[in-house]
């Protein structure tokens, strides 16, 4: 046993691995989660995993029994109804909720349960919707219903005292501070009132206080004693009226479901895939009877009415609250599968799961806090409650963090995510749909958030650092089947990828993590030895290119290069990262015939397109990597050909012009501004990509040394990187230092290194697309610079002639031409 595991077990052996259960975690992992071999799945806050036995039981159940629509009275329907009833009781039992006091309403998920509360709650102009800052967007969304009825909305910060573990239900243990009141303008409310959507005050006005049992951003657990304090009106910020409490348990219920007998909240929401992985698309609203009677549902549907008449205004809703609130036929087969998911939870017990996952999170958290660069700067900034290594008692099995370089600047979370994927580590990045916690912990002001949005940052994009600040974070989270080996794999990943060691020099190379190797200029070959070895044109973006001996240049670079692209049915740009099948489509241009030839192994007929064809009547605009383009579309014949070739609906468009704009990216980390005077076809950044044979040879020697992850040890050729120009005769990576270069009579400016992604790990072999971690994993070990993995350089063609026609006539590239670089 390794020393680190011995150390871990000495501290956490009583909690880790389910020592009192029929199966320990290692035995369970080997039997039920064989698919996890070689990877560390650390996104259980997003979705935990289903076990093999669970899915086998589900399949056996469905294969052995007949379940009919529970709205019927047949034997199969009654069997389904009985299972639904049993499932309701099992869910209530999980939350220790008495069936006499609570009802279980099945929904399509926690979000649907929250929406149901928001739209059915009796909001009035005297109501207040109060929620903690650390709430999911789905909880924040309820405010739209409250605001539309004239209610006040208030976000609050809740800080818990150090002695809360001795909980005596005292408000003095909390510090609650308010944010700005939110109310709709009088004009909007007046419009709503005229349309009958404002409620008059009649009797008691009702209010809601919402908080998560565990914050999905940071893992901070909120004390459930808030339930009693709110319901007893002991919080000074509470206005008059009756208060209901809503708990978002979507994250927390996987390890510590709220005990509703002890803490009788009015509404609790959950999603079952967060607990045991399957089924997805199924959640529940656990609602107290008194609160359920308040919910006034306007819409009625199949299954919710006792009687209705089609041609007059008559409807009588059912008395059973579950039937009133569950529209249409519920997902009865998914509901029937819940019992198979609960089996393993009941075998292990939630208290043991909580101890197991917390032991892993506490161990990793403490180790992360120990990580320092060679200059003693802390590597990890962890978000959540302020804790020491001894007290982490209020944290769930979630760690959210950002990483710093030795100079104090931030690693972008997308860089962390990209590198983690190469190590087989699955984690989550961004703000996790929790804008309040994200802004609070990252120190982002309202103006920061607005300016980030105006700079182009939206959820799920790659803008991870703006104006020197992170826009999101990295999150790892543990589940009931997580192991020490998962934790150790993650820690080794951090150590090897982000911790800077003292600088050493060896044969002219700087050996320092997170920075690019320097080149020993004394070993560079004579400039006269460098020549152009290959020219490759890629007419259709992400499809195969073709090699030529010579080719004309235009203001956009190589003529017809990346002048076409494919869009999906939703208008999205299709690339090999999304559609690997694009790599099997071959292209060829015959300049004399004026035709583009396209063929696919899945199509017998070849497609021919005229280079001079006018498609002006079908002009439209698209956005590609932040650049607006005017494009021309093709007819159904062409689109059908491509759709059948790649196996999904798509359309082909051709670039007719790009709309130039000034650089708007000055605030973004190391993002090069496009030259607004240069025409760009559908390229990501530069007009051309250049790589050298010597750099490829050096990469292959590293791959063959066994240090990489490439099992087959096959050499990587130039085409894996989709270059336009391949040169020969230089030293490895000497192109990194070039500012300008001349090939023949054509001049180019270097736009810097090309940032590589997982697309270079795709390999076409005998018509199949093979995926591996190489060569990107090896490149990441020595070609990283400020969040980018660089290989090759991007070039822009310097058009020194006036007029595009003169450029076409006067500038050709030819294989064999000398290359004259300049570093000044």
Curated annotation (Swiss-Prot):
Reactions catalysed, as given in the entry: Mo-molybdopterin + L-cysteine + AH2 = thio-Mo-molybdopterin + L-alanine + A + H2O
One GO BP: monocarboxylic acid metabolic process
EC numbers: 2.8.1.9
Root EC class: transferase
Pathway(s): Cofactor biosynthesis; molybdopterin biosynthesis
Pfam families attached to this UniProt entry: Aminotran_5, MOSC, MOSC_N
Keywords: Molybdenum cofactor biosynthesis, Pyridoxal phosphate, Transferase
Residues at the catalytic site: 433
MOSC domain residues: 655-822
InterPro entries, alphabetized: Aminotrans_V_dom, MoCF_Sase_C, MoCo_sulfurase, MOCOS_middle, PyrdxlP-dep_Trfase, PyrdxlP-dep_Trfase_major, PyrdxlP-dep_Trfase_small, Pyrv_Knase-like_insert_dom_sf
Cofactor: pyridoxal 5'-phosphate
NAD among keywords: no
Keyword flag Transferase: yes
GO molecular function: lyase activity; molybdenum cofactor sulfurtransferase activity; molybdenum ion binding; pyridoxal phosphate binding
Modified residues (N6-(pyridoxal phosphate)lysine): 274
Function, in words: Sulfurates the molybdenum cofactor. Sulfation of molybdenum is essential for xanthine dehydrogenase (XDH) and aldehyde oxidase (ADO) enzymes in which molybdenum cofactor is liganded by 1 oxygen and 1 sulfur atom in active form.
Family per similarity comment: Belongs to the class-V pyridoxal-phosphate-dependent aminotransferase family. MOCOS subfamily.
Name this polypeptide is given: Molybdenum cofactor sulfurase
Organism annotation: Oryza sativa subsp. japonica (Rice)
Gene from which this protein is expressed: MCSU3
């Amino acid at each position: 046993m390794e020393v680190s595991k011995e150390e871990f077990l000495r501290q956490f052996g009583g909690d880790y691995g389910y020592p009192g259960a029929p199966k320990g975690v290692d035995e369970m992992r080997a039997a039920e989660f064989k698919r996890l071999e070689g990877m560390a799945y650390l996104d259980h806050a997003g979705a935990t995993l289903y076990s093999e036995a669970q899915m086998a039981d589900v399949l056996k159940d469905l294969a052995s029994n007949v379940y009919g629509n529970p709205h019927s009275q047949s034997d199969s329907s009654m069997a389904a109804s009985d299972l639904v009833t049993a499932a309701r009781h099992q869910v209530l039992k999980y939350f220790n909720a008495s069936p006499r006091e609570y009802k279980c309403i099945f929904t399509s998920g926690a979000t649907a349960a929250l929406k149901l509360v928001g739209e059915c709650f009796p909001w009035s102009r005297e109501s207040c919707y109060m929620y903690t800052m650390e709430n999911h967007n789905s909880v924040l969304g309820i405010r739209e219903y409250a605001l539309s009825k004239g209610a006040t909305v208030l976000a609050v910060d809740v800080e818990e005292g150090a002695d809360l573990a001795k909980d005596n239900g005292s408000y003095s243990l909390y510090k609650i501070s308010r944010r700005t009141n939110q109310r709709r303008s009088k004009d909007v409310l007046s419009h709503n009132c005229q349309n009958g959507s404002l409620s008059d005050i009649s009797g008691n006005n009702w209010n809601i206080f919402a908080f998560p049992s565990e914050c999905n951003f940071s893992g901070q657990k909120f004390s459930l004693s808030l339930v009693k304090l709110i319901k007893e009106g002991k919080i000074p910020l509470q206005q008059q009226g009756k208060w209901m409490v809503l708990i978002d348990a979507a994250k927390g219920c996987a390890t510590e479901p709220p005990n509703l007998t002890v803490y009788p909240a009015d509404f609790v929401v959950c999603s079952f895939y967060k607990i045991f992985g399957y089924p997805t698309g199924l959640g529940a609203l656990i609602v107290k009877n008194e609160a359920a009677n308040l919910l006034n549902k306007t819409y009625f549907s199949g299954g919710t009415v006792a009687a209705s008449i089609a041609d007059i205004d008559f409807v009588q809703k059912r008395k059973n609250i579950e039937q009133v609130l569950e529209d249409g036929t519920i997902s009865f087969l998914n509901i029937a599968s819940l019992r198979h998911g609960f089996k393993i939870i009941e075998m292990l017990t939630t208290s043991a799961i909580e101890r197991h996952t917390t032991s892993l999170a506490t161990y990793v958290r403490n180790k992360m806090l120990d990580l320092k660069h060679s200059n003693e700067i802390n590597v990890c900034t962890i978000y959540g409650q302020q804790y020491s290594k001894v007290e982490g008692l209020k944290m769930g099995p979630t760690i959210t963090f950002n990483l710093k370089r030795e100079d104090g600047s931030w690693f972008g979370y997308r860089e962390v995510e990209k590198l983690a994927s190469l190590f087989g580590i699955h984690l989550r990045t961004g703000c996790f749909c929790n804008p309040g916690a994200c802004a609070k912990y990252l120190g982002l002001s309202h103006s920061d958030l607005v300016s980030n949005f105006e700079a182009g940052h939206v959820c799920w994009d790659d803008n991870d650092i703006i104006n020197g600040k992170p826009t999101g974070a990295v999150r790892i989270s543990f589940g009931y089947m997580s192991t020490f080996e998962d934790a150790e794999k993650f820690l080794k990943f951090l150590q090897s990828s982000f911790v800077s060691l003292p600088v050493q020099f060896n044969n002219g190379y700087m050996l320092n993590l997170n920075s690019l190797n320097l080149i020993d200029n004394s070993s560079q070959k004579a400039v006269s030895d460098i020549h152009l070895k290959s020219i490759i044109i890629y007419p259709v973006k992400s499809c195969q290119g073709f090699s030529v001996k010579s080719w004309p240049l235009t203001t956009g670079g190589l003529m017809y290069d990346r002048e076409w692209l494919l869009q999906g049915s939703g208008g999205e740009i299709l690339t090999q990262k999304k559609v690997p099948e694009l790599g099997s489509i071959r292209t060829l241009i015959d300049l004399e015939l004026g035709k583009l030839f396209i063929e696919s192994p899945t199509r017998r007929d070849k497609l021919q397109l005229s280079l001079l064809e006018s498609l002006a009547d079908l002009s439209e605009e698209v956005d590609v990597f932040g650049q607006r383009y005017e494009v021309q579309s093709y007819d159904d014949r062409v689109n059908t050909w491509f759709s059948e070739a790649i196996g999904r609906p798509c359309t082909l468009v051709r670039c007719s012009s790009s709309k130039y704009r000034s650089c708007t990216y000055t605030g973004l980390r190391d993002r090069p501004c496009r030259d607004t005077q240069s025409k760009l076809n559908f390229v990501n950044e530069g007009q051309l990509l250049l790589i050298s044979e010597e750099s490829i040879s050096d990469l292959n020697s590293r791959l063959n040394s066994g240090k990489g992850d490439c099992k087959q040890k096959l050499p990587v050729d130039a085409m894996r990187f989709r270059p336009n120009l391949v040169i020969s005769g230089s030293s490895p990576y000497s192109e990194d230092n070039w500012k300008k270069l001349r090939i023949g009579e054509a001049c180019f400016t270097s736009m810097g290194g090309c940032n590589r992604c997982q697309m270079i790990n795709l390999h076409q072999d005998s018509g199949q697309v093979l995926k591996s971690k190489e060569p990107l994993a090896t490149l990441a070990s020595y070609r990283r610079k400020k969040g980018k993995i660089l290989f090759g350089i991007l070039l822009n063609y310097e058009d020194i002639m006036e007029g595009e026609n003169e450029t076409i006539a006067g500038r050709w590239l030819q294989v064999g031409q000398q290359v004259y670089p300049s570093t000044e």
